[in-house]
Amino acid sequence: MAFNKLESSNNQEIISEEVGILKELLDDATRGIAGEQGLTTIQHLVELYDEGDYEALTQAISEMTNDDMVVASRYFSLLPLLINISEDVDLAYEVNRKNNIDESYLGKLSETFDVVAESDNARDILENVNVVPVLTAHPTQVQRKTMLELTNHIHELLRKHRDVKDGLINKDKWYADLRRYVEIMMKTDIIREKKLKVKNEITNVMEYYNSSLIKAITKLSHEFKRLAVEKGIELDNPTPITMGMWIGGDRDGNPFVTAETLKLSATLQSEVILNYYIEKVDNLYRSFSLSSRLTEVSETVAEMAKLSPDTSVYRENEPYRRAFSYIQSKLIQTLLFFKAGNFSNERAAKRLSENVRLGSVSTGEVVADFVHDRLSQSLQAVSQQTTEFYETAEAFHDDLLAIKNSLLENDDSVLISGDFEELLQAVEVFGFYLATIDMRQDSSVHEACVAELLKSANIVDNYSELTEVEKVAVLLKELQEDPRTLSSTNVSKSETLEKELAIFRTARLLKDYLGEEVIKQHIISHTESVSDMFELAILLKEVGLVDTERARVQIVPLFETIEDLENSNEIMKQYLGYDIVKRWIKNSNNYQEIMLGYSDSNKDGGYLSSGWTLYKAQNELTKIGEERGIKITFFHGRGGTVGRGGGPSYDAITSQPFGTIKDRIRLTEQGEVIGNKYGNKDAAYYNLEMLVSATLDRMVTRQITDPDELVDFREIMDSIVQDSNGIYRDLVFGNEHFYDYFFEASPIKEVSSLNIGSRPAARKTITDISGLRAIPWVFSWSQNRIMLPGWYGVGSAFNHYIEAEEGNLEKLQHMFETWPFFRSLLSNVDMVLSKSDMNIAFHYAQLAESEEVRSVFNIILDEWQLTKNVILAIEKHDDFLEESPSLKASLGFRLPYFNVLNYIQIELIKRLRNNNLTDDEISLIHITINGIATGLRNSG
């Protein structure tokens, strides 16, 4: 399928003009704070960088006072952010323009449908495809919610820029509004002073649903159905996009995630979507003023109208309005019920109705202000009489369908489009739960809990000391033969066990009240054996989520390290062979999900080793499923950076091994990537459209690499990757000075103290590299601009292969031209090298205390230069990013500013380590971290 890359169509002239305006406004704001001299100092730093006089730049920064640093840090942090906003606006403009004139672009859904429609099983593909972006709270999103809101205001103003140029909007007012928001931004705290709590993370993510995701997903789902109808393909209930959520359920290494946060996450999600429904129904109430004198309604709608709390004489002949009033009042009661969250008490709903009637609970406490301020008389009547609540989203959907059918039966079908159709679509996608919440915990915690349960029940005293075979035998016996719950004994339980059981009990209640979709998976971090999966089954059995026939929560192994990925084949062969597992999977529509860890496998073995091991594991696991009639689906635990599996989403999906995407795919969206992709409804629509198009494309596109050649390619990769793994591990785990280099020549300590998430930077005290979480590991290498996880070990391994035999370079060039996986693999290295800067990295190296530690940089520099030469040779390019001119231009805009910020950060770290910064001034380092992450756009 051939697409024009949308990025290459960006209007660089418009962006340059907007950046010029924004820079002018930022200069004015800076002048107001620091005076003309302060602005001159900042401009001088940029001039020195542009001239390449890095020593003079370093000297000039070293002479700045801490007060000067405050202004400079803010300036160089905010300008890349403003450039980002301009580029995002231009991207949205291009998407809309190309859609309106029916011009192709990368990931355009209508063109993907053209290809899918030619497939023999087009209907099955379109009916079953399901892409699930899973939003996580991984600590790489460093902006405050306030800054995100200011960003959105400026985004909206820049969207109007072209209208200003065309004279459709008053230029002076537009400019004044833009000035005001830039001024506010310059005087607003960029970073958080306090560490986030899980509740904050949940509410922050909910803002993306309110501002963009609900609208974008509803629009995309509707467009998906429309295109199917256009192609003459009848679909029942397709769900091309649904959302997932880790926040509130991911307790791996995060002690702050509890049963309460799980419940809070689910109830807040319900509140968000119910408020959306209430607003939509209120719009319909206002617009459906059809009179019974002029149109007829069905008996069902007439009955709803009779039950309406809206008894105004002025609306007695407006049955649709009264029906919508009835629906709206039920939605409010449902919202009251979920807000109370007392799911364990069957009388909760009745009490809530009583409380509302007696005035002890106001609708204003739960209904969004923008809705409550314009509630009709029918809603005010809710506080005066008891109204039913919706027990299920299906019941709500049925009421809407009754109105739709009434309109169809009475020749009013034209009224179905617009808000009504959007509402129906939203209910089908979001239900009352909005997004499926994943639970996740480390396998070692499960083992400790099960060992405690078995001991307290006098079954096994030393479970953890058993062999794997013995463990599986004990666990299977309990799962298949013993109906009792092990936790029912009177033996006191440890805090960990109590906490875990409380979470599982809450999950059971949430599923009972919100539906099966609210929690569908439990992921096991560090899965290393079959017993790891059966241990989770034991805990789920304790609360009735697993029995001998059915697992209401699917057990999902997460294979993370290189070794675990290599062993995943044998582990899953054994697991899928047990009869009880076969029954669980049969009752899950023959799906078994497996999560793949990109971050830890990369930290463990380097970029090439991680990418290739993941590729092979997917092939092998898919084959195992096919042999057993099971659809293996993959959950890709990708981060924002190449070092954590990131890179362009479209290329990442379309380069997956052929045949490994059946119809479902899940992938994590983490940290700053969430804001970049889903910060506004245009960006959200485009990025979701690309995910669906890429998935469909990979499902229908036949193998384009010659099968015989692919055998040779795999043999070549096996040898190169083995070499690369050794080179990487020799440095990271074999060099005696590497640990000190990382901690002294990067801002890892400062990153770990930054208030960017509720989760600690490590699962335990850090004594070596293996104990560090992958996210701060990658984040820190991004900050010092080495980007080591995204390329180290690549150059030497390829070079060894090239030098081994004449013609090997040509083989690699052929692989790059004909094998999508290999092309994507190397293109990502190209991109990450383009964002690295060895001049800056050299100055970070000088932060190391000894010459022996500093010498590690020379090893890294040699490998960087070799990698650059080899990658460009294989690509047949003269420079980085030759196939991504817009990204190259974008970096050209921003590099001078956030590169200067790196030099400022280095000086601040020096002052901190010499105890020359006050507590307030230490936050300046955090501001520079924010600015560099903003400039890079994918840092963790």
From Swiss-Prot:
UniProt EC number: 4.1.1.31
Stored InterPro entries: PEP_COase (IPR021135), PEP_COase_bac/pln-type (IPR022805), PEP_COase_Lys_AS (IPR018129), PEPCASE_His_AS (IPR033129), Pyrv/PenolPyrv_kinase-like_dom (IPR015813)
GO biological process, one term: tricarboxylic acid cycle
Catalytic function, reaction form: oxaloacetate + phosphate = phosphoenolpyruvate + hydrogencarbonate
Principal EC category: lyase
Key word Phosphoprotein present: no
GO terms assigned for molecular function: magnesium ion binding; phosphoenolpyruvate carboxylase activity
Taxonomic superkingdom: Bacteria
Cofactor field: Mg(2+)
Pfam families (alphabetical): PEPcase
GO cellular component: cytosol
Keyword match Magnesium: yes
Keywords: Carbon dioxide fixation, Lyase, Magnesium
SUPFAM superfamilies for this protein: Phosphoenolpyruvate/pyruvate domain (SSF51621)
Active site (record annotation): H138, K603
Function: Forms oxaloacetate, a four-carbon dicarboxylic acid source for the tricarboxylic acid cycle.
Homology family: Belongs to the PEPCase type 1 family.
PANTHER family according to UniProt: PHOSPHOENOLPYRUVATE CARBOXYLASE (PTHR30523:SF6)
Record's protein name: Phosphoenolpyruvate carboxylase
Originating organism: Streptococcus thermophilus (strain ATCC BAA-491 / LMD-9)
